[in-house]
Amino acid sequence: MRRTKHESLQEIFAKLQRGDMSRRAFMRQASALGIGGAAAAFLSQAAGTAQVATPGASPVASPAGEGSALALAEISMNPGSEQPDADPEAVVTINLGAEIDTGDPQVLAFLNEIEISSKVYVPLLALNEENLPAGAGAESATVSADGTVYTFTIREGMTYSDGVPVTAQNYAYAIKRALSPVVAGNYSNTLYAVTGGQAWREADPEGDAAELQVLEDVVSESIRALDDRTLQITLDFAAGYFPYVMAIWVTYPVREDLVEGNGADWWRDIANYVGNGPFRVTSHTEMQEWTFERNEAYFRGVPGIATLIFREIESSETELLAYQQGEFDLMGPAASQLPQIEADPTLAGELQRSVGASTNWFAMNNTAAPFDQVEVRQAFAAALNREQYVTQISAGVGIPAGTLLYPGNPAYQEDFQQTFDEARAQELLATAGFPGGEGFPSQQLLYVADDAASQQQATFFAENLNQVLGVQIEPTPMDEAQLQSLRTNRDPSLIFSTGNWFEDYPHPQNWLSLVFGPGTTRAPLGWDDPTYNDLVTQADQLPIDEAIPLYQQADAYLAEQAPVAFFRHGENLVLIKPNLLGYVTYPTTIVDTVYQAEKIYKTAG
């Protein structure tokens, strides 16, 4: 029988792994088979770190050395239903805001989508109230001596809400699915440490079928269920942040039997949207509401809320009125509503505030003169009056920011912060050759047309920079889609822009590496600093306690080099009715509904 191209690839790849073929010979034969150079080069390099699955093959023992137990924190079993004052039939209503675009955990990207999916599914790991990795779908784990092989033991007796047992195969399917180029998930890059993950995810889904299959096979071998309760994941390199990634939605165990064959919108049929989380969906009316009932089989105990309702109201004014009328049990008000809330004794007494895990910055094109001079960027960073911005533009909501990392992040540092300093800003600009702004080219600061808040922000920056530095900045309106296209395509004509980052998981890598590290497309054009890259690359491979000093150095260096001028950290505002109790507070989350929603309960009345 004539062998297929795929079979030939498997054979020559196996020879390469065994050492029976040189890499040069592999590249030559792969090219003869029609495999692209980039993919062939990747497979050549991957041969030393991963095995491609072949039909009937037995798992190959990892060469990474004996594993040790992964330290996992505890989350107490204390469900709200067991509280003596809990209303057993409690109904809790929350506003979701806008209708979600997708409920698919391996695709979604927005907070409202996470809110919905987190009620239905349990991630492989969770985070406790100190933001430390804890057991969830996996009750324990080990990591190899070189930090590249994680082995998870799936919780015994865990089931989906329909009674079907949860297995390692379910988690393997879901995590692998998050790397599929066909699924095209928005957070696939969080899994790029997985051997073969980036190459498969970034492959053309319409490309050569044999090439795609080989790339997929590498990932299949990197993410595999050894048996019903044992999941093994192999990484290209030690990644100290990896346990944190295992606590986010990309690991939610969607079921293959409910997903495959039902199209990209499989989740819209609630019969398919079945998980192992604290609640199960009972109804969904698009643009109106989602209704959940508690999952009596939830592994952490019966949740304290009998019925959970998410309504969909986009107007913050309407939402606040509904809260005042008792239609919502909690809400997150807009910053602009703070004066109204503080003026109302009842609302003021129900308001809670905490630092938010987000940062805003003013970005400068580091390739465009004069912003290719570090002194110019530093001058702009020193010229921003952050306190005034928070007071005047942000209605007093937020914290002036001098670094990327927010207070409360484990690597937050105060060794070097960007601060408002008029004299220093003027001195730096003069050093760069523009004393008093003389000779400095006029710049446009684009903002979203017909958006009053965007215009107000741009006007503030223009006036602030003119007053301190004497430079001319012209606020210029632009259609939102056009402006977004400039940002997305990293158009070199975009000199100024504003940026922000909202935390996905509370590890410094999610900030310093993903946003400003090697290969990023989120940082301004021209920012690719070898010193910075070396710091974060080293830190990413270490356990967090060893990595923190390096991350702190990187955070300080980033602030000092000023590819952007940081100006604001976020702040959480939450209104909570007095009879809603049991919620767990995290460093940057006042009411946790993602990891410990089962503890929330409501008293009668």
Positions of PLM-derived features:
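Extracytoplasmic/peripheral linker and loop segments enriched in polar/acidic and small residues
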Residues: G80, D85, D217, R224, ...
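Long beta-strand-rich cores associated with HINT superfamily self-processing modules
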Residues: V574-G605
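Extracellular/periplasmic solute-recognition and catalytic clefts
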Residues: T282-E293, P303, I309-A368, E387, ...
